């Protein structure tokens, strides 16, 4: 799994956000965007692929879609579907780091005592507390 890494000294640029709500049979269109997309599942399952790797986004889960990578629905949803989406840009200094790279970076921060002024966001995962995402 990859992890988005960027300096927090350079803020991310918010573009737009919304809440998709669909009653039945939603299938995400095929796109290749120039910005990041953060998805947060609220209800139902979104069946989406990125570069032909299939994912299922369920309630309480998040996923980061990468710029310059094709994403699309690989199957229609069944029943009610709701998820939040947020489009944002990062500065040119962002990196996509694998798990071992993240571990090494965090260990070096602990040893050096330097300030931890970075954003780290895995490409997918589960929210620890879903109370805030179901506003």
Q: Where on the chain are the PLM-derived regions?
A:
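Conserved short histidine dyad/triad with adjacent acidic residue
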Residues: 15-33
């Amino acid at each position: 799994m990859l992890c988005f890494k960027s300096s927090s000294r350079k803020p991310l640029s918010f573009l737009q956000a919304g809440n998709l709500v669909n009653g039945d049979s939603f299938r995400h269109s095929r796109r290749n965007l120039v910005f990041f997309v953060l998805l947060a599942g609220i209800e139902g399952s979104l069946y989406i692929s990125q570069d032909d790797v299939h994912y299922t986004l369920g309630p309480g889960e998040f996923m980061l879609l990468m710029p310059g990578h094709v994403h699309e629905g690989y199957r229609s949803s069944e029943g009610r579907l709701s998820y939040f989406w947020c489009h944002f840009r990062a500065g040119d200094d962002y990196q996509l780091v694998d798990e071992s790279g993240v571990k090494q970076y965090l260990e070096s921060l602990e040893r050096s005592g330097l300030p931890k002024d970075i954003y780290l966001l895995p490409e997918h995962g589960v929210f620890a507390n879903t109370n805030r995402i179901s506003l």
